[in-house]
Amino acid sequence: MLIPQSIRFISRHPLNRGRKLKALARFAAWQIGSRLVPGPVVFEWVRGAKFLVRAGERGLTGNVHTGLHEFGEMAFLLHLLRADDLFVDVGANAGSYTILACAAVGARGYAFEPGPDAYRRLTENVRLNRIEDRVTCLEMCLGAEPGTVLLTDDLDSANHALAPGEPGARTVTAAVSTLDAVLDGERPALVKIDVEGYEAAVLEGARRTLDEPTLLAAIIELNGSGERYGFDESQVVATMFGHGFTACSYDPFTRSLARLSGRDPASDNTLFVRDVPLVAERLTTAEKITVHGRQF
């Protein structure tokens, strides 16, 4: 994200409302300080959770600047999950969602990340938070069937499975399994899938998991990137509806869910909720969270 885009994003972020100057001062301090300090910086985050961040890291620096980079979705996770729930993070990257679920909340987790550099950063953050006993990190892709896939390896948080005919990039070969095979009957309460357009294939290999009544919700990236593989995102929505889920958006300040007819037009991610009244009760009874001095 370029600096002008970053400034716009920070200025408009819900946790920075009424605090624009303070947020921009934090951004400027990071731009200067991160270049003066050699190596990664430990950032104290939420409820004692922390992460290692380096200058230029796209996903994690968003949390430095705003508190919660993807506010609605991350707050939904924090309000929904309870200690010892099972959380599955498909496309974990450096582990933002895994850290929130397993370090801040105390849930158990599976974190899937096939990119070698991102996987190294993920495991660093798991060790930093001393949650190795609660998180299983797996350096692999998930898809519709077992096999292998070529991945880009030089696009930071935008690394993805190479599409047919995609021009040459630096690539690595990754193993592919299915979510159903890996979980082998374990029952998550929440699944997050952010695999840069490969979401439809992941869901195809997760049909047994999607049918589990204990799966309360899923956070799925739907931003048009599936077109590179010939996937129609309306089919992703239809798949989730077919498994009994409702598309929703979430307001963390009012702790209210709003039902949607399809993907969330205001976000790159869409929440899918199985039992809206049950999930709403969990959300409203969760303890308050404080991030960057804002409580919700």
Predicted segments with their positions:
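Phosphate/nucleotide-binding beta-alpha loop and adjacent structural elements of enzyme active sites
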Residues: M1-F296
